[in-house]
Amino acid sequence: MINKTLLQKRFNRAAVSYDQYANVQKKMARHLLSQLEKRYSKAAAIRILELGCGTGYITEKLVHLFPNAQITAIDFAESMIAVAKQRRHVDEVTFRCEDIEKLILDDFYDVIISNATFQWLNDLQVSLVKLYKHLAGEGILLFSTFGNRTFQELHRAFERAKEEKNIKSHVSIGQRLFTKAQLQNICSIKKGNVHVSETCYIEKFTHVRDFFKSIRKVGATNSNEDTYCQSPSLFRAMLRIYERDFTKEGEIIATYHALFAHIEKEGKRRNETNTNKSRLEENCV
């Protein structure tokens, strides 16, 4: 289970540094936005709900791509929203500070979009069912999240450190994330057209501690209530093994496994004339 109070505190603290360190999250965002550009014209008068807007990176681009859209952007970290409100041309955006899993919606949306956020939900399936109900006819729920191969080098180094220290107890580092197949199953909402794709991004750092700093600066450190590593000696062993086993050409590597989901609702679209004929491409990145 994710400790939402702790997570909120960390994201509030990271609001000022998030954009500087969120390299992978921005790559994921650009992929989502490219899919919307293929589906809707610039003139489209669509209703958009953005979940987990953070510092407003996607929000600002949505305003530029779809100037006639009505946009609502939600995040549960007040400091993130404060940064988002400082972006250009977002005066007409409705910002709300709320937890996605406690969200009460009254409207219907042509687009519900979320980037690198749903891994923080404690019950993704329940949230997807609720969100799907608030899609307009032929509306789309488009989101990215992190998959199970994220930080695979870190997890391998941690397991090798446990073996070295002869630790048998079940302790982990980081949270459990979905495989592509698991996410596909979770997204299989009745009467919804579902497509899930995946890709991996490899980031490079001078030292492991630089990698950890990048995680901390985007607020993504472990907020799981399950048992996790608290042993300084085990942590030091993991750092040493990471640098020993996962250094290439003088830099350590870190894998980010990105999953992209597209769920389309059946029914007649509200404003067919303002959409492009092309559909979302169902190809892997």
Curated annotation (Swiss-Prot):
Metabolic or biological pathway, per its Swiss-Prot or TrEMBL entry: Cofactor biosynthesis; biotin biosynthesis
Statement: the UniProt record of this protein carries the keyword Transferase: yes
Source organism, top-level taxon: Bacteria
Keyword Transferase set for record: yes
Keywords recorded for this protein, A-Z: Biotin biosynthesis, Methyltransferase, S-adenosyl-L-methionine, Transferase
Matches recorded under CDD domains: AdoMet_MTases
Cited InterPro entries: BioC, Methyltranfer_dom, SAM-dependent_MTases_sf
A Pfam family annotated for this UniProt entry: Methyltransf_31
This enzyme's EC code(s): 2.1.1.197
EC class of the enzyme, as a word: transferase
GO molecular function, one term: malonyl-CoA methyltransferase activity
Enzymatic reactions: malonyl-[ACP] + S-adenosyl-L-methionine = malonyl-[ACP] methyl ester + S-adenosyl-L-homocysteine
Example of a GO biological process term: biotin biosynthetic process
Classification via HAMAP family: BioC
Function: Converts the free carboxyl group of a malonyl-thioester to its methyl ester by transfer of a methyl group from S-adenosyl-L-methionine (SAM). It allows to synthesize pimeloyl-ACP via the fatty acid synthetic pathway.
Protein family membership: Belongs to the methyltransferase superfamily.
Protein name: Malonyl-[acyl-carrier protein] O-methyltransferase
Organism: Bacillus cytotoxicus (strain DSM 22905 / CIP 110041 / 391-98 / NVH 391-98)
Lineage, top ranks: Bacteria, Bacillati, Bacillota, Bacilli, Bacillales
Gene: bioC
